[in-house]
Amino acid sequence: IGLSLVGSEMCIRDRLRNDQLNNKNKIKIGFIGGGPNSFIGYTHRLAARFDNRFNFVAGVFSKDKKKSKEFGKSLGLDTDRCYNDYKIMAKKESARSDGVQAVGIMTPSGDHYKIAREFIKSNVHIICDKPLTSKVEDAVALEKLVHKNKIVFALTHNYSGYPMLREAKKLVEKNKIGKIKLINVEYPQGYTVAVKKKDEKSTLKWRLDKNMCGPSMILAEIGTHAYHLMRYVTGLEVNEVSAEVNSLSDEISVDDNAFMTVRMNNKARGSIWVSSAATGGENGLKIRVYGTKGAVEWLQDDPNILKFTELNSSTQIITRASDAVSDLSIQSSRVAAGHPEGFFEAFANIYTEFADSIQANLKKNKKDLIHPTVNDGVMGIKFIFAAKKSSNLNSKWIKI
């Protein structure tokens, strides 16, 4: 499909213009978690800086006050705004005229609800790692709080920020592939193959400690991503799931592999395979959607292209930022076609859209939300429990 620089160059100019416009009106943000050696903490901070929409002013980086202040200072923060407890941060920041307007939460999922609840009391907007919580009742309660207080809540299902994944969604919406019949999502990783029992006390403890990872490590870590991707691209909902969730490792006790078959609300069928026990697997996230008129395929290993096949026709390769893609895909890009974009840019799209939603909220304007929301989080935690229940009942079909 033809390639053009026009769309992407316009997008870059628009972003530069927005960068200048928003320089005087940045949203003050703080972070809970993501201390030293945290990849996800680094990712959140980088994503928040990408489009110059946030001013990073405060945070909790350790339960140890000295360590939190030292790390905050290394990030350029005023040490008076580096806390060791989220309740103290919420109280002190709410008392300031220049206090945080938003917080990013990147702690174990069991802590998400109580942290978010504390800041919602002060009308602080939330961007949170997935899964939303570790309990269904906490997720439902959090959703009610968000709506009651009219808070903007974004969930970092960051893969939905990839431009060409968004293009796949647009092709589905335009009925280019017809009625959806089959959906396949897979996400193989391989790190638990080499994990040993002693690693449960290492930096992997969030994933390997049952008390921290919730009812199922693999479903919480990447199963929710696969499930969200299926819903996001197709616009469909999963009605029922039949699952086999287990641990293939002899060294650890948490789940590290899941095979799932799903029934969609349009009677389509789908399959999801997620694993951290796939030897050699890195982050091979892949989605394929098959319909009556065509099919789309996207792979994170090659994120700047989308394969689109029309019925009785050859497969087309659509490239990011080309003249063939939708406005949404163009708006989600930063550099001209031919230059690669990847994980960090996709994550940054969620942050930028979070900022857009906050600005609309402050002006009391209604805005169609592009980023994942608290509702997506509720659906994700319900999916975890349904799949785990199915597995415990010998793969019985369970409604979500």
Place the predicted regions along the sequence by residue.
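Beta-loop-alpha module in the N-terminal Rossmann-like domain of NAD(P)-dependent dehydrogenases
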Residues: 81-145
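Predominantly a Rossmann-like dinucleotide-binding segment in NAD(P)-dependent oxidoreductases
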Residues: 152, 159-252, 306, 394
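N-terminal Rossmann-like dinucleotide-binding module
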Residues: 13-77, 355
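Hydrophobic residues in well-ordered beta-strands that form the structural core
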Residues: 128, 134, 153-155, 184, ...
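C-terminal glycine/acidic-rich active-site capping loop/insertion
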Residues: 16-20, 158, 259, 264, ...
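Single conserved hydrophobic/aromatic residue that forms the stacking wall/gate
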Residues: 1-12
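Glycine-rich, aromatic-lined ligand/substrate-binding cores of catalytic
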Residues: 220-295, 300-304
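C-terminal helix-rich "cap/oligomerization" subdomain common to oxidoreductases
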Residues: 13-25, 104, 339, 353-400
